Amino acid sequence: MKFLFFSLLILLSSCKNDEKKVDELHEKFVNVVEEGMDFNKYPLEIDTLTINDEEFIVIQNDSRDEERMNLLILNLKKDTIYIHDGFASNGFEFEDFDKNGLLDIRLNHITNVGGISELIFYDLESKRFKPIIGFEDFPSPIKIEGSNFYYSYHRSGCADSNWDSDLFYISDFKCFKIGNISGRGCESEERNGIFISRIINEKEFEIEWIKRDKGYYNDKLEFIDNYWKNNYLKFAKE
């Protein structure tokens, strides 16, 4: 749940912080924002994140504000421990994306494609927050149950008659694409149907063409889900 800026006192009181520390936190935040920003125009987005009994404060200014400030993470000592290289234009949320028992930070974005987001993991070894490189290239990602693989979906033009889904995994805080399903139903395409490809060393190799008529494929999401769930291991093997 997001808290408005005027709710910061209540939020931090739940963490057993007094009013003086609230003022100090506000001052800490002000120091990293460009001069002239009007805090009263829109509320700030603030939430607390707990990882292994340690609490953090995630904060950024409202997406409607003309002067955008990158997302910040502070500890309860008021130290700024992470500044993200970007801004969550559609807000942020916490979720256990990789299902490892730790909450992660999703930064959602407003785009023409839809489903674009960034992801921040907490590294238990270094005790630091780290961004996942390339995550924004995989819109609307879904984890394949019982595996460490994920697949995405995005429109590719022609009123959604063309679309793509990528199979990928995350290693060392980076995303690696290993497969693609490409639906091509647009009349202007030389070939219509569903094309399945392996990605090896960032090069695409078509391995299957399921011929279909031109048009909108109503079963595309079901096809994508079933195919990746039943075939992802074939793409994981080199």
Which positions does each model-derived feature cover?
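A short beta-strand motif characteristic of beta-propeller blades
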Residues: 79-85, 130-133
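Acidic, small-residue rich beta-repeat scaffolds with periodic aromatic anchors
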Residues: 16-52, 149, 153-238
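Coil residues (strongly favoring Ser/Thr
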Residues: 47-48, 63, 80
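Acidic/hydrophobic-patterned starts of short beta strands in beta-sheet-rich repeat architectures
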Residues: 53-58, 98-109, 148-153
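Structural motif
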Residues: 67-70, 113-121, 160-168
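Short coil/turn segments at the loop-to-beta-strand junctions that recur within blades
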Residues: 86-91, 134-140, 182-187
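Sec-dependent N-terminal signal peptides
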Residues: 3-13
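Beta-propeller blade termini
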Residues: 44-49, 88-97, 138-148
